[in-house]
Amino acid sequence: TPNAASWTAREYGAHWFALDPPRHLVVYTPESMRILADEHGFRVEEVTFDSQPEEIIFSEQYRRDIPYNAPNSYANTGENGPFAVEELREFNRKTRELNAAGNAGNMCLVLRRGHGD
């Protein structure tokens, strides 16, 4: 699920790829997911951050006013698209850094029944 507390959410704001409806109508933070889980009798057992470079790629593309399905979109052109090879390398590096730091835009949560009391 998208992580609204992430670096990508803060950096890209309204251009953040995860805000692109209808894929995600609600976005959470790790804390809001813990609260929601607790309210419904679950506990968060594990949180993993597993963003892919495309999150930054498409967020940056939106910032540059290039729609997802535009002819020059990365979605249609891949490495021959709107970004230099050096930019794509940096997006990959930044994604690895954010995942390792727990500050990435995508999180995977494992929930278990019970509060663990």
Residue ranges and their predicted role:
Residues 38-45:
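Secondary-structure transition into beta-strands, especially the periplasmic turns and strand N-termini
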Residues 12, 27, 43, 50-51, ...:
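Conserved acidic-Pro-Pro-aromatic motif
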Residues 2-26, 31-38, 60-62:
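Short, glycine-/aromatic-enriched active-site segment of Class I SAM-dependent methyltransferases
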Residues 31, 41, 113-117:
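Short loop segments at secondary-structure junctions
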Residues 1-2, 50:
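Alpha/beta-hydrolase-fold catalytic nucleophile elbow
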Residues 48-117:
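A C-terminal cap/extension of S-adenosyl-L-methionine-dependent methyltransferases
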